[in-house]
Amino acid sequence: MSASQDSRSRDNGPDGMEPEGVIESNWNEIVDSLDDMNLSESLLRGIYAYGFEKPSAIQQRAILSCIKGYDVIAQAQSGTGKTATFAISILQQIELDLKATQALVLAPTRELAQQIQKVVMALGDYMGASCHACIGGTNVRAEVQKLQMEAPHIIVGTPGRVFDMLNRRYLSPKYIKMFVLDEADEMLSRGFKDQIYDIFQKLNSNTQVVLLSATMPSDVLEVTKKFMRDPIRILVKKEELTLEGIRQFYINVEREEWKLDTLCDLYETLTITQAVIFINTRRKVDWLTEKMHARDFTVSAMHGDMDQKERDVIMREFRSGSSRVLITTDLLARGIDVQQVSLVINYDLPTNRENYIHRIGRGGRFGRKGVAINMVTEEDKRTLRDIETFYNTSIEEMPLNVADLI
């Protein structure tokens, strides 16, 4: 939290960085069994009830360092158990008898904040810990009443609403001892940097800071220097991660206007449990949804122009399985944790290659198998090669028997 390290040489990029925006680990302690983490019995019960048996790579490295109170920067891709890593660390450190907010988690989207809240509540099921989602798009008055009635032990929220509640003193920073930034690359990108900084100014100077992210652009690390003290750096390497178990293919569609027919053909060929189709713009989401409906295909759509209630209903239907295909933008690429998603279709390749992992990391989470299909026009070929190089992966042309793989 001191900025005294700014005098370091910048020749090799930020301190603690390897080239290519990857952090260099400085922590090698691994605990590969949940029983050896000295967790409370009621928390362990919740963890096992949630279905965890063995900690993932990031959990083996990061849970203990978080519980010990260190500032931690952890880099690992989607689907590797980052959420449970900090949820377990928070729940272990909460004093249940103290009816005050003791941990604050920030996430870039409302959906991700709600997803984190669900995980915290499930893992803390036998403890009686309270967790509240403090997000935009919901009724402010109702939120104020809730916070005034009894402060929740844990708050998970989006930066705008959290800052508003802190600023108006409905949320007290007095007992907050742990501050978590999830998907920090997204949060610290232009949109939220100032808000996070404002929130940080309101916290105690000895608050523990934990930052989790799939990608680590150098500007994120520069920002971490401003408010983290000698952080533990934990890297779970790209090649150890979630692209494993996900078969990736591309379909050549020479021209943009042929994508719709190709998608409809695919739809008829495959038996889809659940699929997500990613598109780059909100307007195009509406356009494709309309076209699919006109051809009698059942799909639902979601993007940032919709109000929160509508988005909640659509997510609920998709999670419960009553809606099977969801068309969406990158808004959802971070934070949709639907266990049954077996297929991701990139109708448009992401404009930002970092988002590729967030999109296809939806299928095959925690070792489940998944398939990702990329629709590629002539203009997209260079982007596809760029993605292959960046992730050190190979994306093959889609085979005719693709139905057998899903």
Swiss-Prot record:
The modification N6-acetyllysine is found at K118, K174, K193, K238. It catalyses: ATP + H2O = ADP + phosphate + H(+). One of its GO terms (biological process) is positive regulation of transcription by RNA polymerase II. Residues 63-234 form the Helicase ATP-binding domain. It is an enzyme of class 3 (hydrolase). Residues 245-406 form the Helicase C-terminal domain. This is Eukaryotic initiation factor 4A-I. The modification Phosphoserine is found at S4. The gene is EIF4A1. Its EC number is 3.6.4.13. It comes from Pongo abelii (Sumatran orangutan). ATP binds at A76, Q77, S78, G79, T80, G81, K82, T83. ATP-dependent RNA helicase which is a subunit of the eIF4F complex involved in cap recognition and is required for mRNA binding to ribosome. In the current model of translation initiation, eIF4A unwinds RNA secondary structures in the 5'-UTR of mRNAs which is necessary to allow efficient binding of the small ribosomal subunit, and subsequent scanning for the initiator codon. As a result, promotes cell proliferation and growth. SUPFAM superfamilies: P-loop containing nucleoside triphosphate hydrolases. Disulfide bonds: none annotated. GO terms for molecular function: ATP binding; ATP hydrolysis activity; RNA binding; RNA helicase activity; translation initiation factor activity. eIF4F is a multi-subunit complex, the composition of which varies with external and internal environmental conditions. It is composed of at least EIF4A, EIF4E and EIF4G1/EIF4G3. Interacts with PAIP1, EIF4E and UPF2. Found in a complex with XPO7, EIF4A1, ARHGAP1, VPS26A, VPS29, VPS35 and SFN. May interact with NOM1. Interacts with PDCD4; this interferes with the interaction between EIF4A and EIF4G. Interacts with RBM4. Interacts with DDX3X in an RNA-independent manner. The modification N-acetylserine is found at S2. There is a cross-link at K146, K225, K238, K309, K369, K381 (Glycyl lysine isopeptide (Lys-Gly) (interchain with G-Cter in SUMO2)). Its main location: cytoplasm. Residues 1-21 are annotated as: Disordered. It is found in: Cytoplasm, Perinuclear region; Cell membrane; Cytoplasm, Stress granule. The modification Phosphothreonine is found at T158. A motif (Q motif) lies at residues 32-60. The lineage of its organism: Eukaryota, Metazoa, Chordata, Craniata, Vertebrata. GO terms for cellular component: cytoplasmic stress granule; nuclear stress granule; perinuclear region of cytoplasm; plasma membrane. InterPro entries: DEAD/DEAH_box_helicase_dom, EIF4A_DEADc, Helicase_ATP-bd, Helicase_C-like, P-loop_NTPase, RNA-helicase_DEAD-box_CS, RNA_helicase_DEAD_Q_motif.
